[in-house]
């Protein structure tokens, strides 16, 4: 699991600090952002595999942040973090490309489990891309080049 790097995005700094400490104890590499725009700026510099993203934030909310992440970094897996009142937003997030969602407050083991599943999904996709890119187009030995000058 030490390969996986998570970004937590939430405007509640106490939640970020507590969750970051709990994840660090489990050996997870974590960075934090307190807004969607801060998250996007950090993603420019950081190689993040999974983003755990709060739906309800002032300014750029979770849905707008999700759209921007998926547009710029389609391989990053995003897990929406939501309260009971914003389950509809989590469903909207799933429709827009989020991998999963978690209800607040969430159990740290459930959070880690969902992050590991998302990371595994990304690794499979990266492998498929690598295999596809390594294939070379082979021409049939029976293929005869056409003379286009007639």
Stretches with model-predicted labels:
Residues 41, 63-75:
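Short amphipathic alpha-helix used as the core "switch/output" element in two-component signaling
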Residues 106-119:
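C-terminal output helix
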Residues 32-41, 62:
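Helix N-cap/capping motif at the beta->alpha junctions
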Residues 121-150:
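CheY-like receiver
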Residues 13-31:
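Two-component/phosphorelay signaling modules centered on CheY-like receiver
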Residues 57:
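Receiver (REC) domain active-site loop signature in two-component systems and cognate sites
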């Amino acid at each position: 699991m030490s390969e996986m790097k998570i970004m937590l995005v939430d405007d509640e700094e106490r939640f970020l600090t507590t969750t970051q400490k709990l994840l660090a104890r489990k050996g997870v590499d974590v960075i934090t952002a307190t807004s969607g725009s801060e998250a996007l700026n950090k993603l420019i510099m950081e190689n993040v595999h999974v983003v755990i993203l709060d739906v309800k934030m002032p300014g750029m909310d979770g849905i707008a942040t999700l759209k921007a992440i998926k547009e710029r970094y389609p391989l990053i897996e995003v897990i929406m973090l939501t309260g009971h009142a914003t389950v509809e937003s989590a469903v909207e997030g799933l429709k827009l490309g989020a991998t999963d969602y978690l209800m607040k407050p969430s159990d740290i083991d459930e959070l880690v489990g969902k992050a590991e599943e998302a990371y595994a999904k990304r690794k499979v996709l990266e492998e498929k891309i690598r295999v596809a890119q390594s294939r070379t187009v082979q021409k049939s030995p029976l293929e005869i080049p056409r003379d286009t000058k007639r």
